[in-house]
Every structure is written in C-alpha cells, then in structure tokens.
Amino acid sequence: MKRTYQPSVTKRKRTHGFLVRSKTRGGRAVLAARRAKGRKRLAV
C-alpha cells in the first residue's frame, strides 16, 4: 500500500505558501496569528 505523504515542493507551495495565504481573508488571519505568536516561519 502506498504511503499518504508523497512530498512535492510545487504542491506544498501552491497550497500552503505565503502568496496563497496572503490572497484570502482567512489566510491573512493565519499569517497575523503566526506573527502575533512570534513564529520564525509564517508560511511554507
């Protein structure tokens, strides 16, 4: 049986990347929350 996690940089960026997060209101909320928490990395 194939494992569920098949890494791909392209897919990773397109779904969880900074630009994608910036586009939607919810995504911007995620970035704001991570900034407030003091995360070193805001997005992938």
Curated annotation (Swiss-Prot):
Protein name, as recorded: Large ribosomal subunit protein bL34
GO CC annotation: ribonucleoprotein complex; ribosome
NCBIfam families: rpmH_bact
UniProt keyword terms in alphabetical order: Ribonucleoprotein, Ribosomal protein
Region (Disordered): 24-44
Keyword Ribonucleoprotein on entry: yes
Biased composition, class Basic residues, residue ranges: 34-44
Biological-process GO terms, alphabetical: translation
Gene3D superfamilies for this protein: 1.10.287.3980
GO terms assigned for molecular function: structural constituent of ribosome
